[in-house]
Amino acid sequence: MFTRRALILTGAAGLLAGASRRAFAAPPSPNDPVAIVNAIYTRAARGKGDGGGGFIIENNAAKAKYLSKSLVRLWADADAHTPKGDIGPIDFDPVTNSQEPDVKSFKLVTEKLDADRAVIAVTIAGHRAPPAKPEDQVIRYNFVRDDGQWKIDDISGAVDGEPWSIRDMLKESLKEVT
């Protein structure tokens, strides 16, 4: 005969056994490219979704947190060659591929993931009408391992169907100086 205590313990064990393993899984590592990009876009989509992603490049500390050492160096070189008072070579928000951030929702796809490199593609949707060219909604993040941590080594996208890359834009700005 079952006692009330045995019945309760059996029911509790059944509930625990049926609970999703994800409920007990560790949260995603901040050193995981998908988790990093997800965190960037979760922040960019907050509120009205107009905050953008400038926080990843707003100062040297932010750049060091998110970007690879080689990209930080390249950016510093480009900034050093920008005349005082001028806007640097990156004059838009690369996270939202815009001058006026608008992120309502986003979808991440891992295009490549191996031991030292990763490519994460993000398709963003805003509150306003989508761009005429669908490829303008996709931003790609190229990651590399930098001192054992995943860092963004390039951000790329398209405007009016024409591709752009942060790394290429920075390199091009240095060519214009020489």
What spans do the regions from the language model cover?
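Localized chelating/binding microdomains
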Residues: 12-15, 119
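Surface-exposed, charged secondary-structure patches
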Residues: 67-134
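Boundary at the C-terminal end of the N-terminal hydrophobic targeting segment
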Residues: 23-25
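N-terminal secretory signal peptides and thylakoid transit peptides that target proteins
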Residues: 1-13
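Hydrophobic/aromatic beta-strand elements that line small-molecule binding cavities or substrate pockets
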Residues: 108, 139-144
